[in-house]
Amino acid sequence: MTPPRPYSTGLGYESPTEHTVDRTVTSDMAANHLFHRLSELEQTQRRQNAALDNLVSKVEKTDVPKAVGIKDRIACFQWTWFTSTMATGGVANVLASVPFRSQWLYIVGVIFFVFNLCLFFMNTALLLARFRLRPGSFRHSFTDKFESLFIPASLVSIGTILINICQYGVPKAGPWLLTTMEALFWIWTVAAILISAGIYLILWSTLIFPIHTMTPVWVFPAYPLLITAPFAGNLINSSVKAGHTSTLNALPIAMAAVAVQGMGFCLSFMILAAFVYRLMTQKLPRDMQRPGVFISIGPSAFTAAGLVQLGGLAGEILPDDFMMPGMTSHAVFILKLLSAMIGLWLWGLAVWFFLVSVGSFWKYARPEHEAKIGFQMTFFSFVFPNTALLTATYQIANAFSCRPLQIVGCAMTGLLVLVWAVIFVTMIRCIWKRELLWPKEE
């Protein structure tokens, strides 16, 4: 019997030979390969489970959408909705400025005025409800690149309502309303200056607006300043119609209005210069920004309307001893002529911007153009700046006794009322179809 070899398997171990070493290495490699394979399968299974969970969650969101209540819709309300009151009050202003007067025209103007009052209070209530339902949304609205520019629309709406009160209320009421409107004029003027400067300071301190995104909407914070002269002109004119000129301090009102109007026009003119530069370097704004081009009409149109009206009332504004005794009659003539010529110059600029604004929409009238612009509240820019152009047209026509220009203004007034009606009906339709005041998809 032969003794067992050293390191034999019978003793529980074996000396490493060429064959045993190969088997050991092969076993280790197989184990490692199996381990990596199991890890890969486990990772693949995890990815598949995650993808499946994601798919299920998407299906659940699609099949069972979140219910949107009235509070959710109110939370979507923004400052831009005050453009509707600007436009509606502007239409009432134009109807009061039509030179060919009739009882039915006065009634239609009063209807627009009262409807605008209701619309303004409704917008104010809904906006306050939004701020209450969404804490922090008030502060956020001042730093939003889009919404912050439309905050002054609320103040412009108030100014438009005050102008309508001068046109429709003061001639029918006693001196008490005239005195009240005089006090409100000074309050509103101070508020317009402070809010306009404050909004621009907030924007310049917190936001950056690249020049390639520039639109005339940047002028909007200056708009409260631009209706100061029309406000003063209608206030003084209403005192003349009511026969209470002695009740009103017309000269300080007119002087302050000219100063503030010049402030707003110069500021707007500089901003519009940047807009022309943007047009030369970046072409016209995008489709969704295109309605805002009409805002460029407002600065020169409001200034022309206000200055010409104040100049025409110079005989009622200037006292007998104005600046130099015995020179009042000469001063009245000079101011009437100067205001009419400056107004005509600015009116021409407004007409030019009107032609550019209309021309920017020419491509949408072509049959081969299929793209459509979704409705938004900035569509009221089609109306409000053009109300300024029409009131300026009437003032120019009255200053130069130009009957053909008055007839052209009347024809454009009818067209403007039609445009307002189409936009307002479209707004109601979009609210009903959940295209407005509806949470956007994330």
Feature-to-residue mapping (PLM):
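Intrinsically disordered, low-complexity terminal tails of fungal membrane proteins
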Residues: 1-66, 442
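Membrane-proximal N-terminal segments immediately preceding the first transmembrane helix
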Residues: 50-67, 84-100, 129-135, 169, ...
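Juxtamembrane helix-loop boundaries in multi-pass membrane proteins
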Residues: 64-97, 109, 113, 133-163, ...
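C-terminal functional regions that serve as terminal interaction/effector modules
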Residues: 124-126, 340-364, 381-442
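Internal transmembrane alpha-helix with an interfacial aromatic "cap," most often the third helix
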Residues: 164-168, 195-207, 231-241, 267-284, ...
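A generic, well-ordered mixed alpha/beta core segment in the N-terminal half of proteins
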Residues: 166-202
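Membrane-interfacial loop- and helix-cap regions that link adjacent transmembrane helices
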Residues: 236-238, 245-250, 257, 264, ...
